[in-house]
Amino acid sequence: SFGVSQLPDDILQVYKPLLKRFNKILIREVTGKTLLHTQLGLDSQVVLDPTFLLSRSQWEKMANYPLSKQQKYILSFQIINRDVHYDAMLDYLHRKLGYEVIELKDSFRYKPWKWPIYAKAGPKEFLGLIKNAEMVVTNSFHATVFSILFHRSFFCSRNSFGFNSRMENLTGGLGLADRMFDSSTFLHSISDTDVVYEKVDEILEAKISATKQIIEKTFAK
């Protein structure tokens, strides 16, 4: 996975001889497949991120729930610095839905603390916080993945650094392109806060089946 749609020339010179050593390349985004073909002349196949190859119930068994299951909250998790419009967007969702906002961060050093911060989450708590949220707002690929697996309402914020392609491919490929937004225009472009997962699950099940077949065929050789 590259996370971008184009690589600079200096990186290409490093990647090309190394990638040519592989018999087969599997990649988790369509833009990555295009990048490999157009910039490096290499063929690849698109598969799902491995997290999708475990079922929802398998992930649920691993989850810990650090907050009360009765508590209703919007979970905010940003792995890349937010822009100036992000807090206004969270405030809008807080007022619209009436739920508290919980910020998932790696420490308490972030200031000002507009919302309550949860800074003690390991992998199990990460799963539980997403599973129990009424809504997830994030720019994290895997927070998006688990929001989908756990059937959470969610929004993905684009970042100004350009690392958006893998989330755009993920949401677009599942019919969830309207979940992607720019925080500067969010208030003017917000779609329904709920996600209808029936169709999403149909698409996802087909992609999971195809991914497993590709992996099995690859390792059978």
Which sequence ranges carry the predicted segments?
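Active-site anion-handling motifs in enzyme catalytic cores
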Residues: S1-K221
